[in-house]
Amino acid sequence: MKKKIIITVSVLFIAVLTILGYGTANGAFSTTDMLPSEYKIGIPYYQALQSDKPAIVLFYTDWCGYCKRFMPKFKIINKLYKDDYNFVMLNAEAKENSTVVNDAAISGLPTLYIFDPKYENRVHLTNGIYMDLKKLRKELNRYLSIRKQLDFSASCAAK
């Protein structure tokens, strides 16, 4: 009986260590030391809405591990696209953001949108896109290309 208990406990212990090791190796449990709110990237939401540039809007919370892991990528795309996009960070739990959080139907975190006030357009970027920097850049470039076509069409219609 004692031998069965020792074997069972040993197997469970090895299983737990294996799961934790796998999660850590794949970054599932790792986060950066900085909280998302400490990054201070971008401009206030109301300023982005008054701009002609589209905005990349990040909905986050400080307790969200995926939000913490995404922040270095958000910092990179801010540097790469600061001339083409405004960047906005909205804490999904802050009372002052509750209206936009409800309007955007935020159900998971982090959530990334392109808001384009000029064309009253909103594009949700899924986590399959934004967690892969190459895919995210492709999507951001695609949107800029479409926007240039819209700008050209609008200028032709005005003539």
Per-segment meaning from a language model:
Residues N102-I106:
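A short glycine-leucine-enriched loop at secondary-structure breakpoints
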Residues K68-Y81:
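Typically the conserved alpha-helix immediately C-terminal to a functionally engaged Cys/Sec
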Residues F59, N78, K82-S98:
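Thiol-based oxidoreductase modules, predominantly thioredoxin-like and allied folds used
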Residues Q50-D62:
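Short active-site neighborhood of thiol/selenol oxidoreductases, capturing the structured segment around
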Residues G108, Y113-K159:
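Non-catalytic, surface beta->alpha helical segment in thiol-disulfide oxidoreductase systems
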Residues F59, C64-K68, L112:
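The canonical Cys-X-X-Cys-His
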Residues L35-K53:
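A short beta-strand-turn-helix
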Residues M1-P36, C156-K159:
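N-terminal targeting signals for export/organelle localization
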